[in-house]
Amino acid sequence: QRQCERLRDCYKYCMSPKRCTYGTCYCEPSP
């Protein structure tokens, strides 16, 4: 299943989303 259609969808998975690629969220590393 797709996590995201656009970057802002990733905020439910990531504190700092980096990109949404092919429905998958990629996050900035947490400090």
Curated annotation (Swiss-Prot):
The modification Proline amide is found at residue 31. The N-terminus is blocked. The keyword Mitochondrion does not apply. It is found in: Secreted. GO terms for cellular component: extracellular region. Expressed by the venom gland. GO terms for molecular function: potassium channel regulator activity; toxin activity. Its main location: secreted. It comes from the Eukaryota. Disulfide bonds join 4-20, 10-25, 14-27. Keywords: Amidation, Disulfide bond, Ion channel impairing toxin, Potassium channel impairing toxin, Pyrrolidone carboxylic acid, Secreted, Toxin, Voltage-gated potassium channel impairing toxin. The keyword Disulfide bond applies. The modification Pyrrolidone carboxylic acid is found at residue 1. Blocker of potassium channels (Kv). Belongs to the short scorpion toxin superfamily. Potassium channel inhibitor family. Alpha-KTx 17 subfamily. Has the structural arrangement of an alpha-helix connected to a beta-sheet by disulfide bonds (CSalpha/beta). This is Toxin BmKK16. It comes from Olivierus martensii (Manchurian scorpion). The lineage of its organism: Eukaryota, Metazoa, Ecdysozoa, Arthropoda, Chelicerata.
